[in-house]
């Protein structure tokens, strides 16, 4: 009986009638999370966290382990799918004013930070050339923190340079953090269902609601099928599309790659870091590029929730989206003109969106005299 009651509760979950496809990405993220944990477990069974054996163990997984190539590719490309879904999920939250549900937004931003940390630790594990140098550059930023920086870096490295203890630490962190992500995701969903989802109009959803099942379950399954089909097509036909050519070589501390860069989903933050010619300033800008999302619920001044009826903010939002892509593109280029200038302008415009948000809201209120 209890499970029947649970199913009944799930089926009768009241949801706004007019929520669009942009609201499907939450369930897609849940599927991505499950897929990553499952494939990650099978990879961890065969992986060896040792600087002399890590690279060979990845080759062993892809060549010798039955369906190891499939597990490895699903895990690597699944991470990219995860970030595509999460960036769309955040963009939808910004566009439709979902951030006004403060607790849900703050728990979601914390989830993003935890997810980025997990992905970064995972990128280092194959111990390829780019993995090693990306780890060296990014972890070295901790030394910019006054007083505690050097101690924190030494603690994270497990010595005075990146070595075997570093890889062991990163593997342990990459294994344990997903459990934190699962816990925080549960809290995120719990907080969301305290007040319920918003809708594209930004109005009170209580006026007209429908049961979650069957209307939204079918819609969710359709989007999940589309996502898994896309994932399997990339895994089957373009498995190396997101990989860096340098990462097919074993880590060599004596040879620096011509251009050090992290995975594509971190390039916007890395581009902001590189646009500032100062170590501490760059590290602060990097942290702020994510942390600034925490300020959004507190800087909303407009009387309207959704951007659907705010043409000025729509213009700002799409400029922000274009800026995000421009920073991602410039971060793949060498540190030389004109890329440095483009990167600096784009980074300024990135932060300008968050600064102009309250000003635009105040202006709109004045114009509409509401």
Curated annotation (Swiss-Prot):
Heme b b566 binds at residues 89, 188. Heme b b562 binds at residues 75, 174. The chain crosses the membrane at residues 25-45, 69-90, 105-125, 170-190, 218-238, 280-300, 312-332, 339-358. Keywords: Electron transport, Heme, Iron, Membrane, Metal-binding, Mitochondrion, Mitochondrion inner membrane, Respiratory chain, Transmembrane, Transmembrane helix, Transport, Ubiquinone. A ubiquinone binds at residue 193. Its cofactor is heme b. It is found in: Mitochondrion inner membrane. It comes from the Eukaryota. One of its GO terms (biological process) is mitochondrial electron transport, ubiquinol to cytochrome c. It is a multi-pass membrane protein. Binds 2 heme b groups non-covalently. Gene3D superfamilies: Cytochrome Bc1 Complex, Chain C. GO terms for molecular function: metal ion binding; ubiquinol-cytochrome-c reductase activity. One of its GO terms (cellular component) is mitochondrial inner membrane. The keyword Methyltransferase does not apply. InterPro entries: Cyt_b/b6_C, Cyt_b/b6_C_sf, Cyt_b/b6_N, Cytb/b6-like_sf, Cytochrome_b, Cytochrome_b_C_euk/bac, Cytochrome_b_N_euk/bac, Di-haem_cyt_TM. Pfam families: Cytochrom_B_C, Cytochrome_B. PANTHER family: CYTOCHROME B. Component of the ubiquinol-cytochrome c reductase complex (complex III or cytochrome b-c1 complex) that is part of the mitochondrial respiratory chain. The b-c1 complex mediates electron transfer from ubiquinol to cytochrome c. Contributes to the generation of a proton gradient across the mitochondrial membrane that is then used for ATP synthesis. The cytochrome bc1 complex contains 3 respiratory subunits (MT-CYB, CYC1 and UQCRFS1), 2 core proteins (UQCRC1 and UQCRC2) and probably 6 low-molecular weight proteins. Heme 1 (or BL or b562) is low-potential and absorbs at about 562 nm, and heme 2 (or BH or b566) is high-potential and absorbs at about 566 nm. Belongs to the cytochrome b family. This is Cytochrome b.
């Amino acid at each position: 009986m209890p499970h029947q009651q649970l199913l009944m509760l799930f089926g009768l979950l009241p949801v706004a009638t007019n929520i669009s496809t942009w609201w499907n990405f939450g369930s897609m993220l849940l599927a991505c999370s499950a897929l990553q944990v499952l494939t990650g477990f099978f990879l961890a069974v065969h992986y060896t966290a040792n600087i002399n054996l890590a690279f060979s163990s990845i080759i062993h997984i892809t060549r010798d382990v039955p369906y190891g190539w499939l597990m490895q590719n699903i895990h690597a490309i699944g991470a990219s799918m995860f970030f595509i879904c999460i960036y769309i999920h955040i963009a939808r939250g910004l566009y439709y004013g979902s951030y006004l549900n403060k607790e849900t937004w703050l728990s979601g931003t914390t989830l993003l930070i935890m997810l980025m940390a997990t992905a970064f630790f995972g990128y280092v594990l194959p111990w390829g050339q780019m993995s090693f140098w990306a780890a060296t550059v990014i972890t070295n930023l901790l030394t910019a923190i006054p007083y505690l920086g050097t101690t924190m870096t030494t603690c994270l490295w497990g010595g005075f340079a990146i070595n075997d203890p570093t890889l062991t630490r990163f593997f342990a962190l990459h294994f344990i953090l997903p459990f934190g992500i699962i816990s925080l995701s549960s809290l995120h969903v719990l907080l969301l269902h305290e007040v319920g989802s918003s809708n594209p109009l930004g109005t009170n959803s209580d006026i007209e609601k429908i049961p979650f099942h069957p209307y939204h379950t079918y819609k969710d399954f359709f989007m999940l099928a589309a996502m898994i089909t896309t994932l399997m097509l990339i895994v089957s036909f373009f498995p190396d599309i997101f990989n860096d050519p340098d990462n097919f070589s074993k880590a060599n501390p004596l040879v620096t790659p011509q251009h050090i860069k992290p995975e594509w989903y971190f390039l916007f933050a890395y581009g902001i870091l590189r646009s500032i010619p100062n170590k501490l300033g760059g590290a602060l800008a990097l942290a702020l590029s994510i942390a600034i999302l925490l300020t959004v619920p507190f800087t909303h001044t407009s009387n309207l929730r959704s951007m659907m009826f705010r043409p000025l903010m729509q213009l700002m939002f799409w400029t922000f989206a274009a800026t995000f892509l421009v920073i991602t593109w410039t971060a793949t280029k060498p540190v030389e003109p004109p890329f440095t200038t483009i990167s600096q302008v784009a980074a300024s415009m990135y932060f300008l969106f968050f600064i102009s948000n309250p000003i635009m809201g105040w202006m709109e209120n004045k114009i509409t005299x509401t």
